[in-house]
């Protein structure tokens, strides 16, 4: 994330490309291609899988903001949400997280358990970081285990530590060292 990825590279005299941040997940990128035609005019093509929202980026741990794409001739992307409205304000996003924090506490204090189902890459790291930031220093939470399960997530968490730098790496290391966090690293006993 802190390493620049927007370096223009040449394949040959006709094809130039670069990767830029997609703002979706750690390391997520869009591909920009410039193809020089025989008449020396250029075609600018951009390919992206999922792109992150710059409005929600501040709530995603360790994900750099999406880079802006200059005008292009062709833009190819997946269409997860197509034309559906998915916009919210910063205030709404903050209120949503405060409500989630309150609901989690209410459930846990009433003796209930909570199961989060999440992708091993990206979402899981956001959830455990959010829980750590919400409750890591809360006395009432000190004996509540946060159990994460799966072989893949252990590898992905290790990869995060290899990619992150500075304060982000230190924060994620604190999350992974959190005494509440219990990781099942194999399928024994599951």
Give, region by region, the residue ranges found by the protein language model.
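Hard-cation-handling environments
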Residues: 99-190
């Amino acid at each position: 994330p802190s390493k620049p990825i927007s370096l223009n590279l040449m394949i040959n005299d006709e094809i130039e490309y670069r990767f830029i941040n997609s703002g979706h997940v750690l390391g997520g990128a869009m591909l920009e291609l410039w193809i020089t035609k025989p008449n020396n005019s250029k075609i600018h093509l951009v390919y992206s899988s999922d792109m992150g929202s710059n409005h929600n980026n501040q709530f995603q741990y360790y994900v750099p903001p999406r880079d802006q794409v200059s005008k292009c001739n062709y833009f190819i992307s997946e269409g997860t949400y197509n034309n559906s409205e998915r916009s919210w304000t910063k205030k709404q996003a903050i209120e949503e997280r405060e409500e989630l924090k309150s609901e989690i506490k209410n459930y846990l204090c009433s003796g209930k358990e909570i199961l989060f189902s999440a992708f091993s890459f990206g979402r899981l790291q956001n959830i455990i970081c959010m829980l750590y930031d919400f409750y890591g220093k809360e006395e009432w939470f000190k004996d509540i285990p946060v159990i994460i399960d799966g072989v893949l997530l252990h590898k992905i968490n290790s990869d995060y530590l290899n990619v992150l730098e500075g304060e982000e790496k230190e924060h994620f290391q604190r999350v992974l060292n959190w005494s509440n966090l219990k990781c099942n690293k194999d399928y024994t006993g599951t």
